[in-house]
Amino acid sequence: MLVAAAVCPCPPLLVPEVATGAAPELDPARAACTDAVGLLAAARPDRLYVVGPADEGAHGAYPAGAAGSFAGFGVDLSVRLGEGWAEGGRPLPASLTVGAWLLARAGWADAPIEGLGIDNAATPDDCAGTGRELAASAERVALLVMGDGSACRTVKAPGYLDERAAGFDAEAARALGTADVAALLALDAGLADELKAAGRAPWQVLAGAAEGAGLDGRLLFEDAPYGVGYFVAAWS
């Protein structure tokens, strides 16, 4: 059963070594992520799943100890998904690498960890089904859900300006901040793809996991630096 969840954005710029001179701009987001991860620990889960978007070839499960690197962003920094050492496995996708960094930063040692890379093209029904399976995997399950909102909020955004982006992000933020499972499942997958909202599928995994759990939500951070929607929320 799902007992807690933290929702965090997943830009590598969250890592100060990657952001370099721009690092202070995301200090509020980092602080909110730290608070959200702390609430996960307070729920005393038996198992933690880190869920995030993944490109083709990086979908599926990642064991504790799986490694990720920020070398592709010009930084000699590696992280592992919790404790342990997974030899010879696939490297973590970027979203799970950022999640592993957040957990390491918080000193996570409260429950075994597994990672799950989600296909951006997964349907809402498939995502919800995955979430239900995760929630049923242990008596007390927690999720760290990585994902960004639209990437089309300004003309300088990665996806340029799309007038629909602000409304999409507002609804996503409202749903995440109120633990509105139905609203998350109702997010349009096609529109999310057009707006480059990589969080849609992971958020719908969360929605499936939270069905019937009776969790309350709280929005800890909302902003769109660089024209990309970033949200931090805590469910408990």
Predicted regions and their residues:
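Active-site beta-strand/loop microenvironment that shapes enzyme catalytic pockets
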Residues: N120-D169
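Metal-dependent phosphoesterases centered on the DNase I-like endonuclease/exonuclease/phosphatase
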Residues: G159-A186
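Polyanion-binding loop/helix "lid" in catalytic or ligand-binding cores
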Residues: L176-E222
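Short, basic/aromatic-enriched C-terminal tail that caps enzymatic domains
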Residues: Y226-S236
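Non-transmembrane, aqueous-exposed alpha-helical and coiled segments at domain scale
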Residues: C33, V50, P112, R132-A135, ...
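Cap/lid and interdomain-hinge subdomains that line or gate substrate/regulatory clefts
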Residues: L81-G129
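Short, hydrophobic/amphipathic alpha-helical packing segments
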Residues: A29-A41, G99, P124-G131, W203
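A short aromatic-anchored loop/beta-hairpin motif
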Residues: M1-P91
